[in-house]
Amino acid sequence: MGKKKIINKNNPEALKEAGNKAFASLNFKEAINNYTLAIEIQPNHIYYSNRANAHLELN
């Protein structure tokens, strides 16, 4: 059985990394969710850019 990594939801960089992994796995909705949570904690142009890319891939 695979282990699921616990994400620190108060760490925007950890959320970005989780979003990147979801994006790489083609799970764009999960990626968008993680990037959005990161933005809510610490607005950052990279998080916005990553989220925009995930939206483009989703559509």
Report the location of each language-model feature.
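Alpha-helical tetratricopeptide repeat
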Residues: M1-N59
